[in-house]
Amino acid sequence: TLRGPTEDGAASVRLSDAIYETFRLQAIHIPAAAPHPTKLVQSAAMASVAPPKPTYRPKLPVAVLHDGMLSDAQLETVIYAGDAHGAYLAGSWTVDETGDMVSAAPDDAADAVRFRRGFFLGDGTGAGKGRQSAGIVLDNWAQGRRKALWISKSDKLLEDAQRDWSALGQERLLVTPLSRFAQGKDIPLTEGIL
């Protein structure tokens, strides 16, 4: 459900002299969503600006919402990421055989491709970025986009990615380490999370 302005037309956000404000969903309301298990804050400047109203509705297993596998704040992230992933970047492109060279191409070129828009997740400690990332991948997965790259600082975070994916009711072994494949060789997976 989208949230609207107050009756007098003003946004329902109040300014204060605090540096941080308690985080709350501003543009949407997600009925039956669990509150985030820890207190989240945002800068007062961020809290004073209402985010855009998304038009996207995620495709997630019912249990994700009803069993509280993702909190309201984490679901908001999935919604905004889905809003971005539902559109393409401007222009058309050609990609060479190696995948190393991308060049602008006319829209009607026979071998032209388009690229989906991305989404940057910059939440701080305690927001559950791994769980949010798993939710974003799961939403794409449910729509048939079954190839994902999960990039982490080190391979030691593989178990964290597998934990977050399986916490959403998914098979943890679908998160496959890149080290399982020889460098410079094709990766034969037809679907999965690398």
Regions found by a protein language model. Give the residues of each.
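SF2 helicase/translocase NTPase motor core
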Residues: 2-20, 35-69, 95-110, 116-117, ...
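Phosphate-binding P-loop
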Residues: 83-90, 109-118
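Carboxylate-rich, divalent-cation-coordinating active-site regions
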Residues: 72-75
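Walker A/P-loop
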Residues: 114-136
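Short, solvent-exposed loop/turn segments at secondary-structure junctions
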Residues: 83, 126, 155-158
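Residue-level marker of positions within ordered structural domains that often coincide
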Residues: 82, 86, 130, 138
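Eukaryotic nuclear, charge-biased low-complexity tracts
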Residues: 20-26
